[in-house]
Design a protein with these regions (language model features):
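Nucleotide-sugar donor-binding and catalytic loop/hinge architecture
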Residues: 1, 181-202, 227-228
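N-terminal strand-loop element at the rim of the active site
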Residues: 7-13, 26-63, 78, 150, ...
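A conserved mid-protein helix/loop that constitutes part of the nucleotide-sugar donor-binding site
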Residues: 17-22, 201, 205-224, 244-245
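Glycosyltransferase donor-sugar binding loop
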Residues: 41, 206-210, 232-247
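An amphipathic, basic-hydrophobic alpha-helix
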Residues: 60-87, 125-133
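Donor nucleotide-sugar binding/catalytic pocket of nucleotide-sugar-dependent glycosyltransferases
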Residues: 122-187
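Nucleotide-activated donor-binding/catalytic signature segment of Leloir-type glycosyltransferases, i.e.
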Residues: 246-265
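Acidic donor-binding loop of glycosyltransferase active sites
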Residues: 273-276
């Protein structure tokens, strides 16, 4: 079979991108073909895989929902020009045969958190339309779901039948999760690299997508610690996102000097060995 794999943004430290790559590799290992369509690509190119980048210069000046619509228009044209047995999406968009559902239900979160008037905005309408194009009752898209809880949330709002969901097990790579052998030596090396005292309490925040993962709450929690505990504490933030607003928040909370933004890194087991 020949698959079209569709993903807005690929970057190596994203959990979604890692899942995308594992599924792509498995399809190829089983003898299938796959062509990849992305808006942006960061990191090393994939061997033996055609990757088409559909980004536009206007994306740098656009809101996310406008970027998504522009990507989808370009993707639709590419899909018309080529013949695929199945279109597999890792973000919500129309026209998918299979959707890998790693994301939360947009309208559930928005309707609980924001004023009803915001439902009239172009942003809300776009994300609702794209979500409905996957989960609507008149759609045939098959959904690979990572969470029984989130599946029920989608069904509450879209009444999607059970028959369209397949629940997947946790996507943990056991090779990457093996503990380091020399924990004490690794601990010492990591702390020396970042100038963190050996008796400091080292806290770790690991995850790309700081808003979704709740980095603001982690910073507020650090700032709320009892003074004697806070004095000993340092926080490492490991993940790929725009840190500016969170660096500002850390400074406003008086803990800016205690927070280290490391960006995305491949040495998570080593960092875990150093953390408390």
């Amino acid at each position: 079979m020949k698959f079209a794999f569709c993903l807005f943004n690929y970057f190596p430290y994203s959990g979604l991108s890692r899942d995308f790559r594992r599924i792509l590799n498995e399809c190829q290992h089983r003898g299938h073909e796959a062509e990849v369509f992305v808006r942006t690509w960061q990191g090393c190119q994939l061997a033996n895989t055609e990757v088409t980048i559909l980004g536009d210069w206007r994306d740098n000046l656009s809101a996310n929902h406008d970027k998504d619509k522009r990507y989808y228009r370009s993707l639709s044209q590419k899909l018309k020009e080529n013949s695929f047995d199945a279109v597999v999406g890792f973000n919500k968009m129309p026209g998918l045969d299979v959707y890998y559902g790693a994301d939360f239900c947009y309208i559930a979160r928005e309707q609980k958190a924001n004023h009803p008037a915001l439902r009239l905005t172009p942003r809300y309408q776009h994300f609702f339309d794209f979500e409905k194009s996957v989960f609507g009752t008149n759609i045939q898209t098959l959904i690979l779901s990572l969470s029984e809880r989130e599946k029920k949330v989608f069904q509450e709002y879209y009444h999607t039948p059970d028959s369209r969901f397949s629940l997947l097990p946790p996507t943990l790579n056991l090779v990457d999760r093996k503990p380091v052998q020399d924990r004490s030596g690794t601990d010492r090396r990591i702390r020396e690299e970042f100038g963190i005292a050996g008796d400091a309490l080292l806290l770790l925040f690991i995850g790309s997508g700081f808003e979704t993962k709740g980095l603001d709450r982690a910073l507020r929690a650090l700032a709320s610690l009892p003074s004697d505990l806070q004095k000993r504490s340092q926080l490492m933030v490991i993940g790929q996102d725009h840190p500016g607003d969170y660096q500002d928040l850390a400074k406003q909370l008086g803990v800016g000097h205690k927070v280290h933004f490391l960006g995305g890194r491949p040495d998570i087991p080593e960092l875990l060995a150093a953390g408390d």
